[in-house]
Amino acid sequence: MINGIINLKKEAGMTSHDAVFKLRKLLQEKKIGHGGTLDPDVVGVLPIAVGKATRMIEYMTEAGKVYEGQVTLGYSTTTEDASGEVVARSSLPAVLTEELVDQTMTTFLGKITQTPPMYSAVKVNGRKLYEYARAGESVERPRREVTISLFERTSPLNFTEDGLCRFSFKVACSKGTYVRTLAVDLGRALGVESHMSFLQRSASAGLTLETAYTLGEIADMVSKQEMSFLLPIEYGVADLPKMVIDDTELTEISFGRRLSLPSQEPLLAAFHGEKVIAILEKRDQEYKPKKVLI
C-alpha cells in the first residue's frame, strides 16, 4: 500500500473529485482523498492523502488557506466570479484611490460573517444551493462566520478604457471562506458592483504552490517509478501544534491511556522522534488519544 501526502497543483477545468479519481487510477490505489475542495475554475494547491494518510484529511481540511486573486470593479455576475453572467453594472466611485481600497480591505480582517453564493455546494434542506440557482429558485442562505487574517492589495489599480478597475490581492483565511464573496463584499463597501475575476490557492495545510506537482508531472514520475512527489504522513498535521513525547508516554498512548501534558491546545500532534504517532485531544486536564497511528 502507498502511504503519504501529495501536494497537487490542480489545474482549471477539473473538480477536486476529478483529481482524486485520476490519481486513484494512476497510483492504482483506492484509498485516496483530498483535504479541501477547490472550485473547478480555481487552480492551485489541493492537498491529497494516500493510504494511511487519509486519516489526516480532517486536519488538512480544517487548516488555513492562502489565495491570490484579482477583483474587477464595475459589474457583478451570477456566480460572483468571471464564469457567470453579468447581473448589474455600475460606474466607478468619483474618488477611487489605492489608499481608499487598502483602508477598506482592512475592515474585513478578523472574524466576519458571510452569506454563501447561490452558485455553491452549501446544502439547504438537502439540496445544494447551485441546484436552486439553476432551477431559478430562491432560498434563504445560512450565514457563516469565517476568519480573515490577511487581506491586502498586491498590484496597482488598473483602470480600463471601458470603465472598469482591476487589482490583484492576497488573502489568508479560515476553512469555509468564500473568496469570491469577499470580492463582492469589498466592492459593496466601496460602493460599486464587483466580482472575482481570477483566483488561485497558493497555500493550504502547510503546502505551497511552489512545490506542487501537476497530474501530468506525477504521471511522468510514476512511469519512471519515481515517487519523490509522495510526502511523509507528517505533512498532514503541519498546522497542528506539535508535542514530542518520550518512550513511557509512547507506551501509554499505544494502550489508549490519557496523558498529562504541559499544553492548553485543544488538539496536539504527538511525535516520537520524527514520526507522528497520534492525535491527542484535550479532555478536562488530560490528553486522550483521538487517533493512534502506530
From Swiss-Prot:
One of its GO terms (molecular function) is tRNA pseudouridine(55) synthase activity. It catalyses: uridine(55) in tRNA = pseudouridine(55) in tRNA. The keyword tRNA processing applies. It comes from the Bacteria. GO terms for biological process: mRNA pseudouridine synthesis; tRNA pseudouridine synthesis. InterPro entries: PsdUridine_synth_cat_dom_sf, PsdUridine_synth_N, tRNA_psdUridine_synth_TruB, TruB_C. Responsible for synthesis of pseudouridine from uracil-55 in the psi GC loop of transfer RNAs. Belongs to the pseudouridine synthase TruB family. Type 1 subfamily. Its EC number is 5.4.99.25. This is tRNA pseudouridine synthase B. The keyword Disulfide bond does not apply. Keywords: Isomerase, tRNA processing. The gene is truB. It comes from Streptococcus pyogenes serotype M5 (strain Manfredo). The active site is at D39 (nucleophile).
